[in-house]
Structures are given as structure tokens and as C-alpha cells.
Swiss-Prot record:
Residues 2-10, 101-118, 198-214, 292-309 are mitochondrial intermembrane. Most probably functions as a monomer. Binds one purine nucleotide per monomer. However, has also been suggested to function as a homodimer or a homotetramer. Tightly associates with cardiolipin in the mitochondrion inner membrane; may stabilize and regulate its activity. This is Mitochondrial brown fat uncoupling protein 1. The gene is UCP1. One of its GO terms (cellular component) is mitochondrial inner membrane. PANTHER family: MITOCHONDRIAL DICARBOXYLATE CARRIER-RELATED (PTHR45618). Its main location: mitochondrion. Has no constitutive proton transporter activity and has to be activated by long-chain fatty acids/LCFAs. Inhibited by purine nucleotides. Both purine nucleotides and LCFAs bind the cytosolic side of the transporter and directly compete to activate or inhibit it. Activated by noradrenaline and reactive oxygen species. Despite lacking canonical translational encoding for selenocysteine, a small pool of the protein has been observed to selectively incorporate selenocysteine at 'Cys-256'. May undergo sulfenylation upon cold exposure. May increase the sensitivity of UCP1 thermogenic function to the activation by noradrenaline probably through structural effects. May undergo ubiquitin-mediated proteasomal degradation. It is found in: Mitochondrion inner membrane. It comes from Bos taurus (Bovine). It catalyses: H(+)(in) = H(+)(out).
């Protein structure tokens, strides 16, 4: 991304991929309870197994959902699905974020990056990352959504148990369930998030409003998080419902969206908007700040080692 000073050592592709993966994992660990609350709110009155989640317990708002989960199922439940979440970031975020600059440079061929090249880079890296990381997304959402209260025995006892059961009962295609809505969602997220961050950071630095440092990264990340949440929320809700559904509950992604619209109205597509924004906003801040700092420190360390030898 933009903003390297002449004294900086340009980060290599390996450094970018590694930094993106580590930064995304740090952000996931800190913000995971918000993501779990978002999933529970999005699932809402969807049927899980043979029991209506809403008939067992109701969640009110982000904080209310987190408190209710902690009280009724234990604080550990807020981190249910975290191992799959971290696996997802290692296989997903490291590619979509770490390869963004490299792919963008490929499209520009030495020229100044245009909006088209930024969008193209976001589309390509996001699409590839989704396909590779989809099984981890399916397992993460299933574990976050299942409740241990007022219903049948939980479908999964842990991360690897979930992988095994899904592959056994639904086939390998079950691990890629919801790829279409997730691809749509993450193409939107990747383009909006990275392009908005890139443009905002570039504008702040070029107009000398902020230096290319933590405050600049913070502001750019907040703006990127808000824009991304607005555009991706409807697709995110449909994706969560479809991925978490029992076999045969929905015949297709459009069928899932249509049933949501007819049963719950248009507002259903924005369920969990507040936790989504809190999650994306805070996740973006932590991830981008860590990402930028890691890149700089790793390249400084490498430069120091090269000079020493």
C-alpha cells in the first residue's frame, strides 16, 4: 500500500503475507466475542436442527448478547470456533491482504496505481482466498452458532470433530457450503476494505493531513470498516444463515434470501449490523495498525542484519 518513505526498506511479498497473517490472528483473538455475538444475532430465528434458537433464548443487542452468552453458556463460549477462525485468517487474510500490493503492481506494470487496478487486485486476491479458506469459515460459523442449551445435543464437540462430521455426513462439498455467498461477501469486503483503506491513507499522506504512521492507519481503518459493513451486511447475513442451515433447510442461496425476506422482512438483512461494524471497525484498526508496524519492523530487522553481514 502507499506511504513508504525513502528511508524505508520496501517489504517483500513474504513479509507482507506473514505480517498479514499474524496481524489478522491478533485482531481475531481480540474481537472474536463480537463476531460470535454477530453470528448469534444474524442466525436469529433460524432453525437449528429441530429447535428454534429464538424459542430457547433471545438476544438483545451486542452487549446483551455477549452478557447472555457468558451467563448462560459460560465465557468460553464467546470464543467457540476460535481455532477455526485463526486457521481461516492464516489461510485467508494472509493471502487477500498480503498479496494485494503484489497483484496491484502486476496490473499497473510500473505505472501509478489506478482505481481500476486497486479494485482488480481486491477482486482477485479476495476470490482466491475465499476458495482456499472456505472450509475454515464453515466450521467457524457452525461452532459459533450452536447453542448447548434448550435443544438437541450439539452437532459438534470441537473444531476437528466438526471438520470430520461435515465431511462424513455432507461430503467434501459440505466444507465448501456457502462458497457463493461467501465469495460475493468477501469480494465486496476485500475491495471495499483494502481499496478504501488504500485511498484514504493515500489522501491523508499526500495532502499532508497525517504522516504515514499509527494515527493515519487508525483513521483509514475506521473509514474502511464502516464502508465495508454497509455494503457487505446483507450478503453476510445470508451467508451466515445458509452456512449454518441443516441439510435441506434451504434449496439454494437465493431461496435462503427469499425466505428471509418473506418471513422476516428487509430488516433481516441488516441483523447484527452494530456488532458487524464494531467487529469490522475494531478488527480493521487492530489488523491494519499491526500489519503496517510488523512490515516496517521486519524490514528494518532484515536491513540491520544485512548491514551487519
Amino acid at each position: 500500500m502507499v506511504g513508504h518513505t525513502e528511508s524505508d526498506v520496501p517489504p517483500t511479498m513474504a513479509v507482507k503475507i506473514f505480517s498479514a497473517g499474524v496481524a489478522a490472528c491478533v485482531a481475531d483473538i481480540i474481537t472474536f466475542p463480537l463476531d460470535t455475538a454477530k453470528v448469534r444475532l444474524q442466525v436469529g430465528s433460524a432453525i437449528q436442527g429441530e429447535c428454534l434458537i429464538s424459542s430457547a433464548i433471545r438476544y438483545k443487542g451486542v452487549l446483551g448478547t455477549i452478557i447472555t452468552l457468558a451467563k448462560t453458556e459460560g465465557p468460553v463460549k464467546l470464543y467457540s470456533g476460535l481455532p477455526a477462525g485463526l486457521q481461516r485468517q492464516i489461510s485467508f487474510a494472509s493471502l487477500r491482504i498480503g498479496l494485494y500490493d503484489t497483484v496491484q503492481e502486476f496490473f499497473t506494470t510500473g505505472k501509478e496505481a489506478s482505481l481500476g487496478s486497486k479494485i482488480s487486485a481486491g477482486l482477485m486476491t479476495g476470490g482466491v482466498a475465499v476458495f482456499i479458506g472456505q472450509p475454515t469459515e464453515v466450521v467457524k460459523v457452525r461452532l459459533q452458532a450452536q447453542s448447548h442449551l434448550h435443544g438437541p445435543k450439539p452437532r459438534y464437540t470441537g473444531t476437528y470433530n466438526a471438520y470430520r462430521i461435515i465431511a462424513t455426513t455432507e461430503g467434501l462439498t459440505g466444507l465448501w457450503k456457502g462458497t457463493t455467498p461467501n465469495l460475493t461477501r468477501n469480494v465486496i469486503i476485500n475491495c471495499t476494505e483494502l481499496v478504501t483503506y488504500d485511498l484514504m491513507k493515500e489522501a491523508l499522506v499526500k495532502n499532508k493531513l497525517l504522516a504515514d504512521d499509527v494515527p493515519c492507519h487508525f483513521v483509514s481503518a475506521v473509514v474502511a470498516g464502516f464502508c465495508t459493513t454497509v455494503l457487505s451486511s446483507p450478503v453476510d447475513v445470508v451467508k451466515t444463515r445458509f452456512v449454518n442451515s441443516s441439510p435441506g433447510q434451504y434449496t439454494s442461496v437465493p431461496n435462503c434470501a427469499m425466505m428471509m425476506l418473506t418471513r422476516e422482512g428487509p430488516s433481516a438483512f441488516f441483523k447484527g449490523f452494530v456488532p458487524s461494524f464494531l467487529r469490522l471497525g475494531s478488527w480493521n484498526i487492530i489488523m491494519f495498525v499491526c500489519f503496517e508496524q510488523l512490515k516496517q519492523e521486519l524490514m528494518k530487522s532484515r536491513h540491520t542484519m544485512d548491514c551487519a553481514t
